[in-house]
Regions:
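Membrane transport/envelope proteins' first extracytoplasmic loop
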Residues: 1-360, 424, 494-509, 522, ...
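Actinobacteria-biased recognition of intrinsically disordered, low-complexity terminal regions
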Residues: 1-30, 319-323, 640, 679-690, ...
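Alpha-helical transmembrane segments, especially those used as permease/efflux helices
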Residues: 9-11, 37-41, 49-55, 274-279, ...
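Interfacial "coupling" helices/loops that link adjacent transmembrane helices in transporter permeases
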Residues: 31, 362-401, 818-860, 939
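Short beta-strand boundary microenvironments
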Residues: 138-201, 624, 628-711
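Selective detector of the "anchor" transmembrane alpha-helix that sits immediately C-terminal
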Residues: 350-370, 803-825, 857, 861, ...
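Hydrophobic alpha-helical transmembrane segments that constitute the membrane-spanning cores
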Residues: 355, 398-423, 726, 810, ...
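Juxtamembrane segments of multi-pass membrane proteins
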Residues: 492-678, 691, 696
Length: 944
């Protein structure tokens, strides 16, 4: 045997290779090392998409939670507090037992029982909740020092509420005490009043107020202190506002006014109320904790409130406290208003979310398709050498998952950090969906491409490939879904969608996306026909660029459905979303215009000072100030014996007021419509007020329908009369809103009635502070911009608008990415083509034109198709979309329902952007190819 002792063969270097099977290189590691840039690009795409997908539901949760808190905070504690009350103890009880039932210990026991009946997610705010005993029927107080605005004695309620010292601080004197056990026969008790009550009713420390007794002498209530509430707007004081400040009561038929106030007794002085005729009652007030509930808890909150009002919770309270205990609250109505607003906004946000999500999904599929196309030869070779389809797909899934799963987790973590304090379940589900799609897209695409073992396949030119039956069936299925969604939205609208829930609502939200999908499929079907028709004539054209570019466009790969789908979906969503946002802004601006009648409005209940119009015109930003006189309670009637119709009679100067109406498009009219004789129109008010002369008037439709064109009489609030004849009918007029109106020339009115009570201001940048200084006190100054801002009150509105804008922007970004992916996919073939054509004499300028003209047909198809699809989607879906909820948030707003209208900028700008990007990328590719040279692209055996 020849060799060495260490087992090496003679003449060799190093040890001999070990015998046995060879260990193959790990597939995943090898592939990642072979294409690190592609792996990094996929990781970035998955991380970004997962972050956006996870952030969306959390952002929605955050603005909905903020909207719920704003709704609860805006509602007064009197509405949100759940109040339980029970009458005086059973008359069958002894006097001592009845007195014990009104002492603080017994009330505290009932309070604990009430709190125990509160079910989650409703949580009581113990710091602001209260209990006690009070007289439900205030009694007269005859002391002469008390305030009597019209000579009537004030009335006082006796209230013994817990924790008075913890919720107030003495402004003077001390808190009331109950040193000895108080009974129904106690002759004198101590009490405190709030600073507001003391100031209004003229009460001082040491004052004694006598309250009538029930079968006993009057009860003397000595004021020992005046207290200032620590949290005057808290539920402790505002659940029953009377204990904080008195209320002025107006008797009917001008019977006078009187005050009602509250005297705050010591918490353990409740038994004394049994000796008064004030009908004492026990009460327990549960203030909800408004900081804890989320929008996700609204249905549970409503159920908990219903249980306390008339359900199992109230039954438990009656069992443990008193069988006659009853409950009342408006918290259910507050929650219902929030739910209604959210239901009106959520479907609109869902439309944007589905649009952006669809485009993002298409981009991920395109990225996977690009990877599959890049590795077509490799995978075909593996299959030809015996690789099984499941084995190949499993390895593709593994190498994709190694990149996508960490990237998805990174995107989820970024979303959780960027949008804190919201539910995680929806975010995790969204990020998981993105990750799964990224993992399976490449294997599924490879499975369809390599079902059969083949090395070379035929060309799939868009102008020659015929759609398969499966594709036809799939397209017809999508067409049916889109038709159903559009029909459902037109029939039921987003209001029904937001309130019913379920898969039908998701189908409605998908309607714009499905319209874009159908348009993409139709355009892909139609696109080859003009290319086939133009192929012959193009060959007879002079020059090489035009026929070659058309031939290249016709030989584009048939797999253009995904890029076109992404572009059309993004363009449709952008046009639809832009029109929604433009419609919201237009609706707010129009509602604010109707509410003010101009850019600004200065109005008083009395005649304005004579010098005020001049001062206002001199204020910075004011272009014109049009004076008008408005009598809101004028009575229009035909004949003296007929019932009057209340209407607002507006006296105007026909010239300036008519011009203002025309400029604002609020029922414009020529000045001659209101002039009975000649131009005139000084507005001095030279009418006699007798109503003999007939003057022309502009009327609202309802008045015109009732009175026609015959003259009729109008009586003003100062008893003067004017006889008018309706000369024109207008739906709106700047001076009044949501009222029947008659507009006449001020010259026909008496001097008193013609004095202006309002000024309608125009100007681009009105200064509210300067106008208020110039107007002085006693007048109301309203600006159109301020009213418009007030319509954006709920975080539901502002949050939904931000989310909608972000979704549209994300969809546009993904559309650009889809366009770039489509161009990148064709980049190697285009580079090789340019290199070969340059060897044949093609100039650089011709190369640039060739690439631009080659990419222009598809870009032009997407741009024109996107604009038309967006327009069609808006026209189809507008009847079912109500923008009122997101525009004015349920606030009283004139102008009726806000409907979706086409916005030209939203249609044209995205489409033009597609053309610009496509042209720019083609020019950049031509420039870069020219810099690199042609040697690398002219390799022998290249199959491109």
């Amino acid at each position: 045997m020849t060799g060495t002792d260490d087992g090496t063969k003679a003449g060799t270097r190093g040890p001999a290779r070990a015998s046995g099977p060879r260990v193959p290189a790990p597939w995943v590691r090898t592939r990642l090392r072979a294409a690190p840039a592609a792996a990094l690009a996929l990781a970035l795409l998955v991380a970004l998409t997962a972050a956006l997908a996870a952030a969306f539901p959390r952002a929605v949760d955050r603005y909905e939670d903020a909207g719920l808190r704003r709704t609860l905070d805006d509602a007064s504690p009197r509405r949100t507090t759940v109040q339980f009350f029970a009458p005086r103890p059973d008359l069958e009880l002894s006097l001592g037992e009845g007195e014990n039932a009104l002492r603080e210990a017994a009330l505290r026991k009932g309070y604990d029982a009430v709190l125990a009946a509160v079910d989650k997610p409703l949580v009581a705010d113990r710091a602001q909740s209260s209990y006690g005993v009070r007289t439900s029927d205030p009694t007269d107080a005859s002391e002469s020092f008390l305030a009597r605005p019209s000579g009537l004695p004030p009335r006082v309620a006796l209230v013994a509420q817990n924790a008075l010292g913890a919720h107030s601080r003495p402004a003077s004197g001390r808190l009331p005490r109950a040193t000895d056990p108080v009974t129904a026969t106690t002759s004198e008790v101590e009490a405190a009043v709030t600073t507001e009550t003391a100031r209004t009713l003229h009460i001082k420390v040491g004052s004694v107020i006598h309250v009538p007794g029930l079968e006993r002498a009057p009860l003397a209530v000595r004021i020992t202190g005046i207290v200032a509430p620590r949290e005057p707007d808290g539920a402790y004081w505002m659940s029953t506002p009377l204990i904080r400040e008195p209320s002025l009561i107006q008797l009917p038929s001008d019977g006078g006014t009187y005050w009602i106030g509250a005297l705050l007794l010591a918490p353990d002085a409740g038994p004394v109320l049994l000796g008064t005729p004030g009908k004492p009652e026990r009460y327990w007030q549960v203030a909800p904790d408004t900081s804890g509930p989320t929008a996700h808890d609204v249905s549970g909150l409503a159920s908990a409130v219903a249980a306390l009002e008339s359900g199992p919770g109230l039954a438990r309270i009656r069992e443990r406290v008193d069988p006659l205990t009853d409950a009342t609250t408006d918290l259910d109505e507050v929650l219902s208003s929030f739910t209604e607003l959210r239901s009106g906004i959520a479907p609109l946000v869902a439309v944007a979310a589905f649009g952006a999500g669809t485009v993002a999904a298409v981009v991920i599929l395109m990225a996977s398709g690009l990877a599959a196309e890049r590795r077509r030869g490799e995978l075909a070779l593996v299959r030809a050498r015996g690789g099984s389809l499941p084995g190949v797909l499993g390895r593709l899934l593994a190498e994709t998952a190694v990149v996508a799963v960490p990237a998805g987790a990174l995107g989820l973590g970024a979303a959780l950090l960027a949008v804190p304090h919201a539910r995680r379940s929806s975010a995790v589900a969204a990020a998981l969906a993105v990750t799964v799609l990224a993992c399976v897209a490449l294997p599924v695409r490879a499975a369809f491409a390599h079902r059969a073992v083949r090395v070379h396949g035929g060309r799939e030119d868009i102008a020659s490939v015929r759609p398969s039956r499966r594709r036809t069936v799939a397209e017809l299925t999508v067409l049916v879904l889109a038709t159903a969604a559009v029909a459902a939205l037109r029939r039921g609208g987003t209001d029904d969608a937001g309130s019913s829930g379920g898969s039908g609502d998701q189908l409605v939200a998908l309607a714009p996306v499905l319209v874009g999908v159908i348009a993409a499929l139709v355009l892909v079907r139609l696109y080859p026909f003009p290319l086939r028709r133009l192929a012959g004539p193009a060959g007879r054209l002079r020059g090489v660029v035009a026929p070659l570019s058309l031939a290249r466009a016709g030989r584009t790969s048939a797999s253009t459905a995904l890029p076109l789908l992404a572009l059309l979906t993004a363009l449709t969503t952008a046009a639809f979303g832009g029109s929604v946002l433009a419609g919201v802004h237009t609706a707010r601006d129009h509602a604010a215009l109707l509410a003010t009648g101009a850019d600004g409005r200065i109005e008083a209940t009395h005649a304005l000072p004579t010098a005020l119009p001049g001062r206002i015109r001199d204020t910075r930003g004011v272009r014109e100030a049009v004076p008008v006189s408005v009598a809101y309670r004028a009575q229009a009637r035909r004949g003296s014996g007929t019932a009057g119709e209340t209407a607002a009679l507006v006296g105007v100067e026909p010239g300036p007021y008519g011009q203002l109406s025309r400029e604002l498009d609020l029922g414009g009219f020529p000045a001659r419509t209101l002039r009975a004789t000649g131009p005139g129109g000084s507005g001095s008010g030279s009418g006699s007020g007798s109503g003999k002369a007939v003057v022309p008037a502009i009327a609202s439709p309802s008045l015109a329908a009732r009175f026609g064109t015959a003259p009729f009489s109008v009586q003003l609030e100062d008893d003067s009369k004017v006889t008018v004849r309706i000369a024109a009918v207008r739906d709106v007029t700047p001076a009044v809103t949501d009222l029947d109106f008659l507009v006449v020339d001020r010259e026909a009115l008496t001097r008193r009635a013609a004095r202006p009570t309002a000024l309608l201001l125009t100007g681009g940048h009105l200064d509210g502070a300067a106008l208020r200084r110039a107007a002085g006190g006693g007048v109301d100054v309203r600006l159109r911009a301020e009213v418009r801002t007030a319509y954006v009150h709920s975080p539901l509105q502002s949050g939904a608008e931000r989310i909608y804008t972000a979704a549209v922007a994300a969809g546009a970004g993904y559309a650009v990415l889809a366009l770039l992916l489509a161009l990148v996919r064709a980049a190697p073939e285009r580079s090789a083509l340019l290199a070969r054509l340059r060897t044949m004499g093609l100039t650089r300028a011709q190369g640039r034109r060739l690439l631009v003209l080659e990419s222009l047909p598809q870009a032009l198809l997407a741009a024109v198709g996107g604009a038309l699809t967006g327009w069609a989607a808006i026209r189809l879906l507008a009847p079912g979309l109500d923008l009122t909820a997101i525009a004015v948030a349920g606030r009283p707003a004139p102008g009726g329902t806000a409907r979706l209208r086409t916005d030209a900028l939203s249609l044209l700008v995205p489409s033009l952007a597609v053309l610009v990007v496509a042209t720019g990328v083609a020019l950049a590719q031509a420039w870069w190819t020219g810099r690199r040279g042609s040697v690398r692209e002219l390799r022998a055996g290249d199959g491109r």
